[in-house]
Amino acid sequence: MLKSSSLNKCCLAVIGAFSLFSAAQADASTLRIAMTAADIPLTLGQPDQGYEGNRFTGIPLYDALVEWDLSQGEKPSGVVPGLATEWHVDPQNQRRWIFKLRPDVKFHDGTLVNADAIVWNVGKVLDKAAPQYAPGQIGNTLSRMPTLTGAEKIDDSTVALTTSEPDALLPYNITNLFIVSPTAWEKIYAAVPESTGDTAARSKQAWTTFASQAVGSGPFKLEKLVPRQQLILTKNADYWNKDRVPKVDKVVLIPLPEANARTAALLSKQVDWIEAPAPDAVDQIKSQGFKIYANTQPHLWPWQFSFLEGSPWKDIRVRKAANLCLNRAELKSYLGGYMTEATGVYEEGNPWRGKPTFQIKYDPDTARKLMTEAGYSESKPLQVTVATSASGSGQMQPLPMNEYIQQSLKSCFFNVDIKVTEWNTLFTNWRLGAKDPAAAGINAINVSAAVNDPYFGMIRFATEKAFPPTATNWGFFTTPETEKLATAVKHAFTPAEMDKAAGELHAALVDQVPFLFVAHDVGPRAISPAVTGVVQPQSWFIDLSLVSKKE
């Protein structure tokens, strides 16, 4: 439980941070949420701050062609129609997908969402010759859809997306491409003085301005953005999906990266909802009538190992030893039960689990035996360095968790050094890879990962095509077997084929242990009893449009 002195200090800090809020923002029409991010995620279409950005700026402000079903929490979230009502791979060309668009959907500025708008939005991240090309949005986008190569208008309500190779996973991938209003952006671009510079300079300025005047087609509209302080969203009463017209008039999003500060904000009723409460504060939070929501998520909290020459993790005995030395059940207890033990990317019961030969469990004696075989001992420990963050999307409680791992691995002849940086910086460095100067002296990185589908959960960590900066194979791990199996997954265009291919890839991945498999998050959040209608899906995301707030 939080000590009273710490809580009092946090309360004072929070009261100061919230002094800019008006009394009206505490009424029943306004939902106030404290995020783990240190800044407001980008609002210009392609969010940063990991999937907390998609959760709080992408999904509320925008729509995608294909979206996640966040309406229930009894089973894993699947994809459902968004701006596209249907899609299929071209039977004559498996590198071409056809999407039929939903009729009569309008952006917040009243203009239509049509095929031209979709092509324009693909151009913002792919077409270097287009005025709207936004290099600053590429890193948050293309690593999540690396095979996408272009878009073609077939007619006003039909668009084709092309890929560099057959890719059965594209519908999952494009849940990350949020569609902004071309007309709104072009008006801003036209107003940028030519004296600003060339097309690229004017475009950059236009996107900067657009961030505070964002226009999408989502259930919420942007009212006010104050970087590092707050984002105010307002209800889109004309939203096309009547089941998702928001129940509250406004949402105020506040960045509060420190868990104790978030807890203090909740207990002092400065906010209605906090992400990732501190585990030692959960009993105190519950005792004051707040509710803890949690559910299984397609999430992995790992250490991702470097496979560069000179990295100690190239020795599979070392990789296996680290995985066998960690008591995940004890860590779960330490976190108040708010995690699931990771024995792979996918657990028993998941159709993509397969049948790994190597069993990840707590077996410190075998771990020490492996380390001894590898040449290490209590008097000659292995020095390893992991990079992590103090907070961030999906990072759970990164500092206490890494400190626990540090102490645990010490008993198996590991000497762990922890390097801490700001979340967005760590996330950027993750995409740059282990060869980048930012990774100097680091041989493992702790970045939580969404594992919604076989690309996100496996392919982007196990193939040469996913080497940085294309995707997030930070450690440059690959084997001929994972390459072959990843190709089979991409060519699996039926559910049965996908389950078989993905299961075989997962078994191979676990057997090669490119990660320290630690935990799966359950996404705990603490919410005021005045807030109702919360659906905690089995997802990284949540639908704010379903939420109500009473007096």
Regions found by a protein language model. Name each.
Residues 35-92, 215:
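N-terminal lobe/hinge region of extracytoplasmic solute-binding protein
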Residues 220, 309, 337-374, 390-401:
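Structural transition elements
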Residues 68-69, 234-239, 297-321, 325, ...:
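A bilobed periplasmic-binding-protein/Venus flytrap-type ligand-binding module shared by bacterial periplasmic
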Residues 100, 139-198:
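Surface-exposed binding/hinge segments that line
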